[in-house]
Amino acid sequence: MSLSDLKPVIERAFENRDQINAQTKGEVRDAVNEALNALDSGKARVAEKFQGSWEVHQWLKMAVLLSFRLNDMSTIAGGPGENTNWWDKVPSKFEGWGEAEFRKAGFRAVPGAIVRRSAYIAPNVVLMPSFVNLGAHVDEGTMVDTWVTVGSCAQIGKNCHLSGGVGIGGVLEPLQANPVIIEDNCFIGARSEVVEGVIVGEGAVLSMGVFISASTKIIDRATGEVHIGKVPPYSVVVPGSLPGKANPDGSPAPSLYCCVIVKTVDAQTRAKTAINELLRD
């Protein structure tokens, strides 16, 4: 079936998801498997940019969710120790892969990198020991550094750097309407977290320890403009705080966390955050 043919089948199945289980056969199972294969190969993605705006294909997210009802628990090779397994419903992307498959895929996956089936990893990506969840899309030339987690259906652009310990939120639990999107050429500093469908605009730089959710205020220090849910392109963002209102007795109330845009990316910023082409040969 074509992608356009899969969509109505999956949408109908999702409406009747209480009737879907591991014994379900036929059209629904075939449609979900085809959708997951399309995500896994990069032929489809949960979100795409169209005429300057991001469009979310909710039916592909539905396919990911339905797969949990369709698939029973089973052993997955690669557990700790010799001849041991994991126990889950989602197989590894690398199940059955050998040298030929890795060479064709064109990315690096060092020991300790875990990718679940239906996540797409583009050529010239580097996966350090990290976790990429199902339905995610990691585009060309991106570095996924040590202990990074890329959540379900998250969209990571080209030539990004996700520094050590970064967390990119998923859509499955708690259930989110839209995935987190990191656009091309972004730098996400160590231990930062971006969740709840936030969009980080192209070329933006988040310093170490920046936490952004759908309700976090992102304040431009120069203009006072407040952004919520999206980091403007080419912004340099650091953690900050907003002063609390005074208590009834006049004492200061606790301040509230926010993010602060301190400047626009310049040559000095680019020099500090540039990707290393030597690591992608």
From Swiss-Prot:
InterPro entries from the UniProt entry: DapD_Trfase_Hexpep_rpt_fam, Hexapep, THP_succinylTrfase_dom1, THP_succinylTrfase_N_sf, Trans_hexapeptide_repeat, Trimer_LpxA-like_sf
Gene3D superfamilies: Hexapeptide repeat proteins, Tetrahydrodipicolinate-N-succinyltransferase, N-terminal domain
Superkingdom, natural source: Bacteria
Localization terms from the record: Cytoplasm
GO molecular function, one term: 2,3,4,5-tetrahydropyridine-2,6-dicarboxylate N-succinyltransferase activity
Pathway: Amino-acid biosynthesis; L-lysine biosynthesis via DAP pathway; LL-2,6-diaminopimelate from (S)-tetrahydrodipicolinate (succinylase route): step 1/3
Record carries keyword Acyltransferase: yes
Catalytic activity: (S)-2,3,4,5-tetrahydrodipicolinate + succinyl-CoA + H2O = (S)-2-succinylamino-6-oxoheptanedioate + CoA
GO cellular component, one term: cytoplasm
Any Gene Ontology biological process: diaminopimelate biosynthetic process
PANTHER family reported for this sequence: 2,3,4,5-TETRAHYDROPYRIDINE-2,6-DICARBOXYLATE N-ACETYLTRANSFERASE, ACETYLTRANSFERASE
Subunit structure and binding partners: Homotrimer.
Protein name: 2,3,4,5-tetrahydropyridine-2,6-dicarboxylate N-succinyltransferase
Native source species: Parvibaculum lavamentivorans (strain DS-1 / DSM 13023 / NCIMB 13966)
High-level lineage: Bacteria, Pseudomonadati, Pseudomonadota, Alphaproteobacteria, Hyphomicrobiales
Gene: dapD
